[in-house]
Amino acid sequence: MGDWSFLGEFLEEVHKHSTVIGKVWLTVLFIFRMLVLGTAAESSWGDEQADFQCDTMQPGCGNVCYDQAFPISHIRYWVLQIIFVSTPSLVYMGHAMHTVRMQEKRKLREAERAKEARGAGSYEYPVAEKAELSCWEEVNGRIVLQGTLLNTYVCSILIRTTMEVAFIVGQYLLYGIFLDTLHVCRRSPCPHPVNCYVSRPTEKNVFIVFMLAVAALSLFLSLAELYHLGWKKLRQRFVKSGQGMAECQLPGPSAGIVQNCTPPPDFNQCLENGPGGKFFNPFSNKMASQQNTDNLATEQVQGQEPIPGEGFIHIRYAQKPEVPNGASPGHRLPHGYQSDKRRLSKASSKARSDDLSV
């Protein structure tokens, strides 16, 4: 059937730069398709036309009936299927090898320029340049595709998936699923319907079902690989978008600074600084006691007659020592009233205790 070594060497290179599912697909292609097709299936269809017997002596009728029964041999059809399905992978391999060569040349040029700039010595590429130049990375021993190489790889999977579906549908339309033992031919130049018999139909049916199952498995692996690459790409985008949103929600350096608000004009009348820098309620027992004392003195003064020649009473308050918040001093007249030396009793018609003590 030919030498498969050339195709095998190329597919081995593809195997090095593929994902895990892609490596499984290549294993299925090597073992279950190329190996089985080259060893067992070819021997079953080797005597296909010679053992195709028809019950007629009409010249040319047997060839016409064989062409009607088998428009293309199963072996040749499967060989074409393998070639067309493997071609996208070969294109991807060519692109990968070209990319590797270009990267090596670029690194050599950069190294030569660095040596010329520094005079001598080895040059090591920074990590950023390596990531920028390479089209894949090795993470934990696995190759992570990225960039244009990833796009080429996805396109190769799409093309081989389309080819796989086309060849499966074509085989079903040409032959169906199983071969019949008896084939009735009604083509010219056969004078009447001619019965033709297929050799070893059961063995051929086994190989046909096996190759269809392998094709379905390869199609499933291709779809699984597309799903794997697409899901991983979407997950990376979601992770990047989540990180971007988290960075946007982080407070800036000036967000934690609390701005001091300007208090209202009468704020100091409501709050006073107590001992230790704490605020306490100004309406304490001290303030209440002082207010009661003032009210009592005012009532006593208002109960007396006014002094002639004076329109109002002059009241003088003296500073009192601070009384603790919990203590309430007794009700007594302020010092201003006790030390007042004016003779209010002479101007009043009422008798007072001061008038009797001369």
UniProtKB/Swiss-Prot annotation:
Coiled-coil portions: none
Record carries keyword Nuclease: no
Gene3D superfamilies: Gap junction channel protein cysteine-rich domain (1.20.1440.80)
TM regions (residue ranges): 20-40, 77-97, 165-185, 206-226
Region (Disordered): 318-358
GO MF annotation: an example: gap junction channel activity involved in atrial cardiac muscle cell-AV node cell electrical coupling
PROSITE patterns: CONNEXINS_1 (PS00407), CONNEXINS_2 (PS00408)
Keywords: Cell junction, Cell membrane, Gap junction, Membrane, Phosphoprotein, Transmembrane, Transmembrane helix
Topological domain spans for side Extracellular: 41-76, 186-205
Cellular component annotations (GO), alphabetically ordered: connexin complex; intercalated disc
A family per Pfam: Connexin
Major localization class: membrane
Modified residues (Phosphoserine): 353, 357
Cellular location(s): Cell membrane; Cell junction, Gap junction
GO biological process: angiogenesis; artery morphogenesis; atrial cardiac muscle cell to AV node cell communication by electrical coupling; atrial septum morphogenesis; atrial ventricular junction remodeling; blood vessel diameter maintenance; cardiac conduction system development; cell-cell signaling
Topological domain spans for side Cytoplasmic: 1-19, 98-164, 227-358
Its membrane topology: Multi-pass membrane protein
Oligomer and partners: A connexon is composed of a hexamer of connexins.
Entry similarity comment: Belongs to the connexin family. Alpha-type (group II) subfamily.
Function noted in UniProt: One gap junction consists of a cluster of closely packed pairs of transmembrane channels, the connexons, through which materials of low MW diffuse from one cell to a neighboring cell.
Annotated protein name in UniProt: Gap junction alpha-5 protein
Species this chain originates from: Canis lupus familiaris (Dog)
Lineage: Eukaryota, Metazoa, Chordata, Craniata, Vertebrata
